[in-house]
Amino acid sequence: MALDKSVILLPLLVLVLLVLGCLGRESRAKKFQRQHMDSGSSPSSNSTYCNQMMKRRSMTHGRCKPVNTFVHEPLVDVQNVCFQEKVTCKNGQTNCFKSKSSMHITDCRLTNGSRYPNCAYRTSPKERHIIVACEGSPHVPVHFDASVEDST
């Protein structure tokens, strides 16, 4: 009798654990927003911007993320890039898109010699076209691939 109950309960327990694991996981679109969107501010020449933002956005937990870009445009404008010029991603995938116009961004690069837990970043405000990888339905950005200067 006890064996019968465990045969029923074990698959149920596995199912519950799988569902709970999925509920707590950040979607790729939400991760993109957390790591790359800063719509409420303009590019900052404040030298501590990247140090503050990288920490605030959980990119210095357990390691120092070497490079990151923040986009200072409305989310809808960045989402619309998914319907603009299709380009090949750096990794060879074909789901990347380049913005028609330049966008205000801030590049954050780990400074030489900086080591976890003391992550220190160089802040570089720029105006560039962005390239993002998009997925899903509706098509939304899930990866920041690159930024490029105006080709004109």
From Swiss-Prot:
S-S bridge residues: 50-108, 64-119, 82-134, 89-96
GO biological process assignments: defense response to Gram-positive bacterium
Catalyzed reactions per annotation: an [RNA] containing cytidine + H2O = an [RNA]-3'-cytidine-3'-phosphate + a 5'-hydroxy-ribonucleotide-3'-[RNA]; an [RNA] containing uridine + H2O = an [RNA]-3'-uridine-3'-phosphate + a 5'-hydroxy-ribonucleotide-3'-[RNA]
Location (main, coarse): secreted
Positions annotated to bind substrate: 31, 34, 65-69, 90, 109
Signal sequence region: 1-24
Catalytic-site annotation from UniProt: 36 (proton acceptor), 143 (proton donor)
Gene3D superfamilies (UniProt xref): Ribonuclease A-like domain
Cell location: Secreted
SMART domains referenced in this protein's UniProt entry, alphabetically: RNAse_Pc
Family annotation (SUPFAM superfamilies): RNase A-like
UniProt entry keywords in alphabetical sequence: Disulfide bond, Endonuclease, Glycoprotein, Hydrolase, Lyase, Nuclease, Secreted, Signal
EC supergroup of this enzyme: lyase
Cellular component annotations (GO), alphabetically ordered: extracellular region
EC number per UniProt: 4.6.1.18
Chain positions carrying an annotated carbohydrate: 46, 112
Coiled coil: none
One of the record's GO molecular function terms: lyase activity
Protein task: Endonuclease that catalyzes the cleavage of RNA on the 3' side of pyrimidine nucleotides. Acts on single-stranded and double-stranded RNA.
Record's subunit section: Monomer. Interacts with and forms tight 1:1 complexes with RNH1. Dimerization of two such complexes may occur. Interaction with RNH1 inhibits this protein.
Family listed: Belongs to the pancreatic ribonuclease family.
Protein's name in the database: Ribonuclease pancreatic
Provenance organism: Macaca mulatta
Gene this chain is encoded by: RNASE1
